[in-house]
């Protein structure tokens, strides 16, 4: 199961940490795993491995300000849930569209 790490630019350019897991054969589709409120991407590792074992690619990622998408210090850092939904989620989907243009999302 190939796994790669990525820095996906959000729609405003903020870098988002992501892990892309792909089955050994051709994937049927790709799943964007949007975590629960401030839940780190690693929490969904077992789910992603299950998807890959069933021929789906999976993208795990951290919202801005959380996990590996957090700056070294959160002092003075501003991230709103609105940013997660309007700037972060669509950028990850764009990345998946570019990476897997012919697969369902």
Tell where the protein language model's regions lie, with residue ranges.
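N-terminal cap/lid segment of alpha/beta-hydrolase-fold proteins
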Residues: 1-25
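Conserved beta-strand positions that form and line the central face of beta-propeller blades
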Residues: 7, 33, 83
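Alpha-helix C-cap/termination motif
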Residues: 24-25, 54, 99
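Active-site glycine-rich loops that stabilize anionic/oxyanionic intermediates
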Residues: 25-28, 33-39
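Conserved acidic functional residues
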Residues: 36, 62, 88
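Alpha/beta-hydrolase active-site loop
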Residues: 43, 78-99
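Conserved alpha/beta-hydrolase
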Residues: 43-74
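Alpha/beta-hydrolase fold nucleophile elbow
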Residues: 100-105
